[in-house]
Curated annotation (Swiss-Prot):
Pathway: Lipid metabolism; butanoate metabolism. Optimum pH is 7-8. Its EC number is 2.8.3.-. Belongs to the acetyl-CoA hydrolase/transferase family. Butyryl-CoA CoA-transferase subfamily. This is Butyryl-CoA:acetate CoA-transferase. It holds the Pfam family AcetylCoA_hydro. The active site is at residue 245. One of its GO terms (molecular function) is propionate CoA-transferase activity. The keyword Cytoplasm does not apply. The fermentation acid butyrate is of special interest, as it has been shown to serve as the preferred energy source for the gut wall and also influences cell differentiation and apoptosis in the colon, and this seems to aid in protection against colon cancer and inflammatory bowel disease. Formation of butyrate via butyryl-CoA CoA-transferase is the only available route for butyrate synthesis in the majority of human gut isolates. Coenzyme A-transferase that converts butyryl-CoA to butyrate. Can also use proprionyl-CoA as substrate in vitro. The keyword Calcium does not apply.
Amino acid sequence: MDFREEYKQKLVSADEAVKLIKSGDWVDYGWCTNTVDALDQALAKRTDELTDVKLRGGILMKPLAVFAREDAGEHFCWNSWHMSGIERKMINRGVAYYCPIRYSELPRYYRELDCPDDVAMFQVAPMDAHGYFNFGPSASHLGAMCERAKHIIVEVNENMPRCLGGTECGIHISDVTYIVEGSNPPIGELGAGGPATDVDKAVAKLIVDEIPNGACLQLGIGGMPNAVGSLIAESDLKDLGVHTEMYVDAFVDIAKAGKINGSKKNIDRYRQTYAFGAGTKKMYDYLDDNPELMSAPVDYTNDIRSISALDNFISINNAVDIDLYGQVNAESAGIKQISGAGGQLDFVLGAYLSKGGKSFICLSSTFKTKDGQVQSRIRPTLANGSIVTDARPNTHYVVTEYGKVNLKGLSTWQRAEALISIAHPDFRDDLIKEAEQMHIWRRSNR
């Protein structure tokens, strides 16, 4: 069947398409790399006509046009599934709010929401010969999002990579209300946050020493996971697999070094499985039309049952800080939301259930405040208002540049002792004093 005629019938300008949106509507803006561009600019032109339009999305990679005006909050409200630096600034302006989620559950949220989307709009790759628009590197929850949306608008971007996968990786033209051809902006890029530091490299070495041949990898975003990836690429490891929430540049380096073939994976053999990808153009070019990659919905990639089915699963993630009980905060600085819960807990739990699996929470032992003060990331208790991303019974390995400790099965005093042993030496005595006051320190430890 030739879908070109239907394409012509549904093709409209961005200005025409956004006329579907009314005051009070819920509107999905896409996710990460396929957040709308031309449609965002078109909706911004209608600001004065609209009130209480509730927008949903996450991991914004550039500022939105609808929030350019100072009074934008009187017309639009941003609801984020996961915060980027841009969204943190929007929270400070009072125009954005975080939606706490367990990322693996997000498709179900959409299928059961009391307030489904009035309009869902997002960027896609050009239509293929079969009438499908590929979601690009963001299968994630988009299929579920489209199922209950009253109207769907796709913004075609010729630069969007066509990402192959299993299910829910695109939408058929028959399900689309309008098609908009945008200006084909470059896909938003997300770097690793600068080159790896000596601390990053020290942590990476401690983790790589724990990775066996044939392991299946999950890497988070940031300097430390990328440092781990670089070290793996230079190592003698072989027959590695990938099953991850987020595909990052480090995986490209590991794959091109010949370390990844997926031959030992118990499921999805020979495929690198991921829910969404965000990185540099190098990564997008690698993802494009690559049959080795498998883009999949997040309720599959992050399902504990999927993760635990893969032997020797190695999960590597960052944290903001951790307390002496082993509670991990990976998303906030006190009451200030930094990122989101994402799928970290899913992988912490799934990796431990995997035969031979291990979960690593990595962090530098210290950080500097804006006024130059050095503080410990290992704290007696989390700061007031900080979020517990991973509860203490779930925390497995914790790694700093001073060592790695396994918290599973340890009592409170053993946990305190273990964590203090990998804290920066300048803070250990103070941590011991705090542990004594908390009644989780035994004098015989000294």
